[in-house]
């Protein structure tokens, strides 16, 4: 399946289609959007975002704890869309505050 991903960035929102077997960060870059990242392995908080709507599968990541995931945080480098999803990007400072 392919879903519509909307990223709400500091520069404004962007939208693109993302297959359910491709990481949101990877697809965003293919579409020409620059997003923050570091490890690309789900082991840090550089790419953190917050889900405003929809759902993702980020089971490949290991940095976020259950409470952070419950609060809506997402690591875009290991997140597969499970529905149409809206994610607020650039949330590392909020996550680590």
UniProtKB/Swiss-Prot annotation:
Where can this protein be found?
A: Plastid, Chloroplast
Q: What is the recorded name of this protein?
A: Ferredoxin
The task this protein performs is described as: Ferredoxins are iron-sulfur proteins that transfer electrons in a wide variety of metabolic reactions.
Organism per entry? Solanum abutiloides
Known cofactor(s): [2Fe-2S] cluster
Q: Which GO terms describe its molecular function?
A: 2 iron, 2 sulfur cluster binding; electron transfer activity; ferrous iron binding
Q: Which family does it belong to?
A: Belongs to the 2Fe2S plant-type ferredoxin family.
Q: Which GO terms describe its cellular component?
A: chloroplast; chloroplast stroma
């Amino acid at each position: 399946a392919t879903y519509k991903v909307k990223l709400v960035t500091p520069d404004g929102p962007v939208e693109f289609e993302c297959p359910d077997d491709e990481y949101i960060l990877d697809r965003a870059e293919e579409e020409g959007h620059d997003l923050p990242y570091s490890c690309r392995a789900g082991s840090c908080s550089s790419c953190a975002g917050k889900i405003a709507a929809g759902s993702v599968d980020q089971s490949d990541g290991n940095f976020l704890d259950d409470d952070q995931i419950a609060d809506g945080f997402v690591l875009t480098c290991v997140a597969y869309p499970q529905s149409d999803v809206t994610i607020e990007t650039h949330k590392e400072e909020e996550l680590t505050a």
